[in-house]
């Protein structure tokens, strides 16, 4: 899948990602889906999406025929609600009123995990992460191991304004769409 956010115009990084995505898909007999990651309602603009689609078409990158041409996160609220309901049923979700300033870094310390806050105005929702390792195979680097609970702590899945977070939306989308390979750049 190629999944840009329409928060600005297509740039060289997008083009490189598109070339690699289409190339890897073709080399492995896969298909390319276009997913517009427009979860950030404050920064996403229709004219950026239109320009992005025009630029991709001009470059010759179009979603594969027969697939849903464009998937938009803004059209998938019910999918996210269903995923949230599953997490709630497993008692993995809790309300959190911590601001970015209070957290102060990349790792959330779990302050609200046991506070018993009520969901509503002024709170976001976090998912309780399991302790331990997560493993995966990186096509370039080989087998990898990470500890998300130690690296970032419990992840925010819906913010105080009721918007789905990037981390939650892309994870649910990839699971829902049965994506097996994700291409990201490394810095």
Stretch-by-stretch model annotation:
Residues 183-187:
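Positively charged, low-complexity/disordered segments
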Residues 95-182:
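Active-site cores that bind ATP or allylic diphosphates and position pyrophosphate for catalysis
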Residues 1-105, 175:
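N-terminal Rossmann-like or analogous alpha/beta NTP/dinucleotide-binding catalytic cores
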């Amino acid at each position: 899948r190629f999944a840009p956010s329409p928060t600005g115009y297509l740039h060289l990084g997008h083009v490189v990602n598109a070339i690699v995505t289409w190339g890897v898909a073709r080399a492995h007999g896969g298909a390319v889906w276009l997913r517009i990651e427009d979860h950030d309602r404050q920064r996403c603009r229709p004219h950026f999406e239109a320009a992005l689609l025009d630029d991709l078409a001009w470059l010759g990158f179009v979603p594969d025929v027969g697939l849903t041409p464009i998937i938009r996160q803004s059209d998938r609220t019910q999918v996210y609600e269903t995923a949230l309901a599953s997490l709630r049923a497993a008692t993995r979700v809790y309300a959190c009123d911590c601001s970015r300033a209070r957290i102060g870094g990349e790792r959330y310390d779990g302050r609200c995990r046991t506070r018993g806050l009520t969901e509503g105005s002024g709170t976001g929702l976090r998912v309780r992460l399991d302790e331990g390792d997560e493993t995966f195979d990186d096509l370039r680097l080989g087998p990898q191991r990470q500890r998300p609970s130690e690296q970032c702590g419990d992840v925010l899945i819906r913010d105080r304004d009721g918007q789905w977070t990037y981390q939650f939306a892309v994870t649910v989308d990839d699971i829902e769409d049965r994506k097996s390979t994700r291409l990201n750049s490394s810095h």
